[in-house]
UniProtKB/Swiss-Prot annotation:
It is found in: Secreted. GO terms for molecular function: sodium channel inhibitor activity; toxin activity. This is U11-theraphotoxin-Hhn1a. Belongs to the neurotoxin 14 (magi-1) family. 01 (HNTX-16) subfamily. It comes from the Eukaryota. The presence of a 'disulfide through disulfide knot' structurally defines this protein as a knottin. It holds the Pfam family Toxin_22. Residues 57-69 have a biased composition (Basic and acidic residues). Keywords: Disulfide bond, Ion channel impairing toxin, Knottin, Secreted, Signal, Toxin. GO terms for cellular component: extracellular region. InterPro entries: Toxin_22. Residues 22-74 form a propeptide. It comes from Cyriopagopus hainanus. Expressed by the venom gland.
C-alpha cells in the first residue's frame, strides 16, 4: 500500500511541477501573442483609417465637381418674353406664342407645359 501512495505522490509531484512549467510557458506565449496581436491591431487600424479617409474625401470631390458642372444657367421665368430660336425658359416651362390677342412686345413667352 505504501508503494501505491509513494507512486501516486511521485506522479502528483511530477504533474504539478510540469504543469507549472507549462503554465509559465503558456503565460509567455500569451504575452507574445498579445504583443503580436497589438501590432496586427495597429496595422489594421491604420489601414482602416486610410480607407475611411479615402471614402470621406471621395464624396467631397464629387460634390465640388457636380456643383461646378451641374449649375443651371440663368433661365427665364413664367410669363417672360423669350427667343424662339434660343429658349432659355426654366425647367418645366416652354417658349410658346401667346394665345390671347393683343399687342405684345415680343411674340414668344415662357409658359408652363
Amino acid at each position: 500500500m505504501n508503494t501505491v501512495r509513494v507512486t501516486f505522490l511521485l506522479v502528483f509531484v511530477l504533474a504539478v511541477s510540469l504543469g507549472q512549467a507549462d503554465k509559465d510557458e503558456n503565460r509567455m506565449e500569451m504575452q507574445e501573442k498579445t504583443e503580436q496581436g497589438k501590432s496586427y491591431l495597429d496595422f489594421a487600424e491604420n489601414l482602416l483609417l486610410q480607407k475611411l479617409e479615402e471614402l470621406e474625401a471621395k464624396p467631397l470631390e464629387e460634390d465640388s465637381e457636380e456643383s461646378r458642372n451641374s449649375r443651371q444657367k440663368r433661365c427665364i421665368g413664367e410669363g417672360v418674353p423669350c427667343d424662339e430660336n434660343d429658349p432659355r425658359c426654366c425647367s418645366g416651362l416652354v417658349c410658346l406664342k401667346p394665345t390671347l390677342h393683343g399687342i405684345w412686345y415680343k411674340s414668344y413667352y415662357c409658359y408652363k407645359k
